[in-house]
Design a protein with these regions (language model features):
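Patatin-like phospholipase
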Residues: 2-248
């Protein structure tokens, strides 16, 4: 609830820069954690896992022109085959050292893991939301080495991962479709691996539930543009949706 409130309170003027959005998100993270960082690492019930990608080539640059060229190359390669994204990204799973995530060895893309600790927690959280052209990448993530780290959803948009074990994986989601990567959103033929999801229980909003929300959808990042200059109306819409989700 605190995160929802803080995110709802964000204000972005037309023409906001990547640096300004990153600074705003850093302040939001500071307000959210408020010196309680350690509680995320010693929670007795939950183990935090954060997925980011290390960006290669032009994707390591936050200059709009060079970054735009890099993204164009990613889009073209992704159309030829998802495996070609290994030229552009390396997957990094930053996890609670008390328990590694329950995954089979990751062989689809270059991947590695890193222990989550106080020294890299905030940078990892910030990197996990660093969408290219929206926010700056996070430089030189502590423990991960030099480089530019961005939102792990670029590779693993909906966590189409090879889970192992006999337990059921509960996946609260915002849609009833599992889309492998960010660049697959407009590719209806790019589907998740059914074998990897055979023990996944997907919990998603029904069409009837969405129809009852203002504008017939969940709030999303595009609302900042939709309601630019009218944050009061966006706040009201988002608060209504959050209240409905809390009731649900």
């Amino acid at each position: 609830l605190d995160l929802g409130r803080l995110y709802n309170e964000q204000r972005f003027a037309k023409g906001v820069t990547m640096a300004e959005v990153s600074q705003s998100c850093q302040r939001m993270l500071d307000d959210l954690l408020a010196g309680r960082d350690a509680t995320l690492l010693d929670n007795p019930h939950y183990r935090l896992n954060i997925v980011v990608v290390k960006s290669h080539g032009l994707l390591a640059d936050d200059h709009r022109g060079r970054l735009g060229l890099g993204l164009s190359s990613v889009i073209a390669d992704n159309l030829r085959g998802r495996a070609r994204l290994s030229r552009h990204f390396e997957r990094l799973i930053i996890h609670d050292p008390r328990q590694a995530p329950p995954l089979h060895p990751l062989k689809d893309f270059p991947s590695r893991s890193l222990d989550l600790e106080l020294g890299n927690l905030r940078q990892a959280l910030l990197a996990s939301g660093s969408i290219p052209m929206v926010m700056q990448g996070v430089r030189d993530l502590p423990g991960a080495g030099a480089g530019t780290y961005r939102d792990g959803g670029l590779l693993d948009y909906h966590l189409d991962l090879p889970y192992h074990g006999d337990d059921i994986v509960l996946y609260p989601h915002f849609t009833d479709r599992v889309i492998p990567g960010w660049f697959d959103k407009g590719l209806p033929w790019r589907r998740s691996n059914p074998q990897g999801l055979q023990d996944v229980l997907l919990l998603a909003p029904s069409r009837e539930y969405l129809a009852r929300l203002p504008y017939g959808k969940l709030p999303d990042r595009s609302d900042f543009k939709r309601f630019v200059g009218d944050d009061a109306r966006r706040n009201q819409y988002w608060q209504t949706a959050m209240s409905e989700s809390q009731r649900l």
